[in-house]
Amino acid sequence: MAGSGVLEVHLVDAKGLTGNDFLGEIGKIDPYVVVQYRSQERKSSVARDQGKNPSWNEVFKFQINSTAATGQHKLFLRLMDHDTFSRDDFLGEATINVTDLISLGMEHGTWEMSESKHRVVLADKTYHGEIRVSLTFTASAKAQDHAEQVGGWAHSFRQ
């Protein structure tokens, strides 16, 4: 798979998060998400006082260059609890394999994974809630032009 494009991540919300705040009320967490694709990171806003069921409705974009990347394409969603007077607490992580999304986007120009829920887990795979996102990959015009010039499968299926 060769080419480049943009991976758009729509961070919707999370449900049933469990926190580690020992000093505050149980469930009194201020969650945010660090979205990571390879070396690129984006950080959501802090959902202050939203506790276990935060809502963000934010969109993040990542530049994808699949010619330099081999193997699996994974998106990591690391959920954190913002603490004012101490280090932020790790709430859990969700991992989404986006390899097929990128492949289909390269082939068709754009491809979408509709809103879906993903398990938030700790390192030992203990369930800590769920997060809801939708994803869209759009191939760059240069990648699409290359597919048309080469002909092959992408070209032969057009009607």
From Swiss-Prot:
GO terms for molecular function: calcium-dependent phospholipid binding; metal ion binding. Residues 1-112 form the C2 domain. Keywords: Calcium, Calcium/phospholipid-binding, Cell membrane, Cytoplasm, Membrane, Metal-binding, Phosphoprotein, Plant defense. The keyword Transcription does not apply. Isoform 2 is expressed in young vascular tissues and tiller buds. Phosphorylated at Ser-44 by CPK18 in a calcium-dependent manner. PROSITE patterns: C2 (PS50004). It comes from the Eukaryota. The keyword RNA-binding does not apply. Binds 3 Ca(2+) ions per C2 domain. One of its GO terms (biological process) is defense response. Ca(2+) 3 binds at D83, S86, D89. Ca(2+) 2 binds at D21, D81, D83, D89. Pfam families: C2. The modification Phosphoserine is found at S44. Ca(2+) 1 binds at D21, D30, D81, D83. Its cofactor is Ca(2+). May play a role in plant defense signaling. Isoform 2 binds to phospholipids in a Ca(2+)-dependent manner in response to pathogen elicitors. This is Elicitor-responsive protein 1. It comes from Oryza sativa subsp. japonica (Rice).
